[in-house]
């Protein structure tokens, strides 16, 4: 007879939620992770009283009330709203691109005016079907915004000219013809007040966790301990 019903590889969000659901269903679960901490890429640590996101900032956001009701069982969330601002040569511009951005650059005040300006610049560039990131960006927000707020940043990020980058990279870029600085268009959003690590610890409460264990380094032995590996 196997020692565990489930061996969960990875103590990130997926692994922790699966382990919680399995344990609540009466299953015996072991969670392992090759890192020396739980929470995967949403791991947060306290540095001088500040919750630092070691692997980059993560903002929880969803429109699904069932998901929200579930996750708030394990953490209290603040009402953090991500409203980035870009500084270009001393001028501040709202992100994601929205009517505040278009008003600052072109002086337009209605969605119709902004859409017309974008279309005008798209036609001036002769773009019908975008074939690279530059053409896709101009199609989405016009040449002025592309030159000021996209081109330099993107080329620095990827180390290649925008004309050599595929169009799909920027297709998910939020563009809104409304006065809305909220990066995520989601009903529920925020960051756990106690940090993501504490939230994941709450999810894993009462569940056996072993850190510093690399599944791929001893796959057969570890897999033999459980009925199923997740």
Identify what each model region corresponds to:
Residues 4, 26, 207, 226-227:
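Short, well-ordered alpha-helix to beta-strand connector turns
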Residues 23-48:
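Glycine-rich FAD pyrophosphate-binding loop
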Residues 4-31:
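N-terminal Rossmann-like FAD-binding beta1-loop-alpha1 element of flavoenzymes
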Residues 7-9, 32, 224-230:
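Short hydrophobic core segments
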Residues 48-124:
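Dinucleotide-binding Rossmann-like beta1-alpha1 core, especially the glycine-rich loop
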Residues 91-93, 100-226:
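Active-site/ligand-binding neighborhood in enzyme catalytic cores
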């Amino acid at each position: 007879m196997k020692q565990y019903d489930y061996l969960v590889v990875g103590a990130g969000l997926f692994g922790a939620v699966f382990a919680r659901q399995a344990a609540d269903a009466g299953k015996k679960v072991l969670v392992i992770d090759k890192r020396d901490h739980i929470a995967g890429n949403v791991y947060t640590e306290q540095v001088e009283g500040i919750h630092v996101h070691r692997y980059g900032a993560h903002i929880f956001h969803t429109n699904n009330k069932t998901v929200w009701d579930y996750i708030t069982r394990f953490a209290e969330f603040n009402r953090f709203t991500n409203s980035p601002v870009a500084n270009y040569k001393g001028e501040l511009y709202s992100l994601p691109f929205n009517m505040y951005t278009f008003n600052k650059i072109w002086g337009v005040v209605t969605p119709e005016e902004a859409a017309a300006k974008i279309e005008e610049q798209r036609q001036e560039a002769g773009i019908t079907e975008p074939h690279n990131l530059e053409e896709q960006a101009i199609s989405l927000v016009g040449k002025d915004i592309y030159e000021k707020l996209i081109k330099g940043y993107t080329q620095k990020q990827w180390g290649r000219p925008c004309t050599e980058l595929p169009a799909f990279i920027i297709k998910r870029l939020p563009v809104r013809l409304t006065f809305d600085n909220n990066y995520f268009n989601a009903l529920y959003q925020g960051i756990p007040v106690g940090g993501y690590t504490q939230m994941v610890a709450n999810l894993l409460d009462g569940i056996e966790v072993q850190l510093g264990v690399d599944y791929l380094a001893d796959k057969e032995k570890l897999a033999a301990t459980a009925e199923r590996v997740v």
